Structures are given as C-alpha cells and as structure tokens.
A protein has these predicted regions:
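Predominantly the C-terminal beta-signal and adjacent terminal strand-loop region
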Residues: 138-198
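Short glycine/proline- and aromatic-enriched beta-strand/turn motifs that initiate or cap beta-hairpins
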Residues: 20-68, 167-169, 195
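Outer-membrane beta-barrel channels and translocator barrels
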Residues: 26, 69-71, 114, 158-160, ...
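Repeated loop/turn-to-beta-strand initiation elements of outer-membrane beta-barrel proteins
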Residues: 73-76, 117-119, 159-164
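Residues on the lipid-exposed face of transmembrane beta-strands in outer-membrane beta-barrel proteins
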Residues: 33-39, 60-68, 80-82, 105-111, ...
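Outer-membrane beta-barrel translocator domains and adjoining extracellular loop/strand segments
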Residues: 43-50, 88-95, 131-138, 174-179
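Residues that define the transmembrane beta-barrel architecture of outer-membrane proteins
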Residues: 27-31, 52-60, 99-103, 143-149, ...
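Structural signature of outer-membrane beta-barrel domains
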Residues: 38-42, 83-87, 126-130, 167-171, ...
Length: 198
C-alpha cells in the first residue's frame, strides 16, 4: 500500500513539474505591445465629508513589455506604460475628478505555475505627466514620483496575452499631507497583448 501511495505521489509531482513551464525555451526574449483599461482608485488616508464616497476613474492603459525566460517556470519582464490613473470623489450633488496620468515602468517576475498561466509580482516606478482636479491644473500639488507594487495573473494563448493586475501604491500622491491625509493612487488594469519572439 505504501508503495502504491509513493508511486502515485511521484506521478503527481512529475506531472506537476512538467506542467510548470513556460511556452518558450530558456533564454528566449519576447516583446509584447499591450492595450487595455485602467480603473484608478483612491487609497490611503483621506478625510471624508459626511456622505462622501470614493469612486473609480476609468481610463486607458497602453505600452510595451519585454520578457526574458530565465527558467522553465520563471520569466523576468520590464515594461513602459502610459496609464490614466486617479479617482472620483462624490458628495451629495458634487463630483470631483482627480486626473493623474503617468508613465509607469514595471519590473515584474512571472511565475509560470501551469502552462500558459503566470502569477506575477514586482515593483513599479511611476512618473507623473499631468495632474488635474476637474479641469484645474493640480500638478504643483502632486508628487512627481509614484512607487507601487503590482500583483496579478496572466494567461497566454496563441501568443495573445490577457493580463490582470492590481498596482498597490506605496508612496503618497499629495505633497501637503498629515496623518489623516495621505492619498495613494491605486490602479487595477486589464490588458490584451501580443507576444513577438525576438
């Protein structure tokens, strides 16, 4: 009985090991243009007025990402993205829209747990392009640099890649802040890309 269990366990481990690989050989380089939607949200500490609600700001995410396949289960990716971030804040009869547009540089490790599927995490460096509160310029009030931790999952099929990730902002957006007001610009993004082998 013990032998049967051991053989079964070895078979499961072997199958899992074979499944835990990328779709490409070690040492391969790929380039992936991508486009999709971003859903910006205000996180951190924010003094809420009575009846106030934080809302999502929807925008565009587009860019390009290169990936190096280091092992059968690990890819290292670096990219450059344009992202429309920010948020909406609603109180009765009034909506304020914070429009923050960034160039983001993500550095991500892709862990290929099964063929085609990758879990990912890393770091992201954001550089502010424009900032508006409704239609008023707000750039002088905003930090020029944003640091975030992206976490996500992707699936590749016939070179097409669907990527969903959440960028947890670490650094605050507002220059003038205190213990009760430390605004952070989170971003959930869903993109479709196509991988070219170099």
């Amino acid at each position: 009985m013990k032998k049967i269990i051991m053989i079964a366990l070895m078979a499961i481990v072997t199958c899992t090991a074979e499944a835990q690989n990328t779709l490409r050989e070690n040492g391969t380089l790929t380039l992936q243009p991508k486009i999709g939607a971003g859903f910006g949200y205000l996180s951190g500490k924010f003094e809420m007025e009575p009846g106030g609600q934080r809302r999502i700001r929807t925008g565009i995410v587009l860019g390009v990402e290169g990936e190096y396949y280091a092992t059968e289960w690990l890819g290292i990716a670096a990219g450059v993205n344009y992202a429309m971030q920010g948020w909406k804040y609603e109180i009765p009869n009034v909506t304020t829209v914070m429009k923050l547009n960034y160039i983001n540089i993500p550095l991500v490790a892709n862990f290929y747990v099964v063929k085609g599927f990758a879990l990912k995490t890393g770091v992201q460096f954001g550089f502010l392009l424009t900032a508006k509160q409704n239609e008023d310029d707000w750039k002088s009030n905003a930090e020029k640099f944003n640091f975030a931790i992206p976490v996500g999952i992707s699936y590749e099929f016939n070179n097409f890649v669907i990527d969903a990730r959440y960028n947890f902002a670490v650094s605050p957006v507002n220059k003038v802040r205190n213990d009760d007001n430390r605004w952070r610009s989170d971003l959930m993004q869903l993109t479709l890309g196509y991988k070219f082998t170099l």
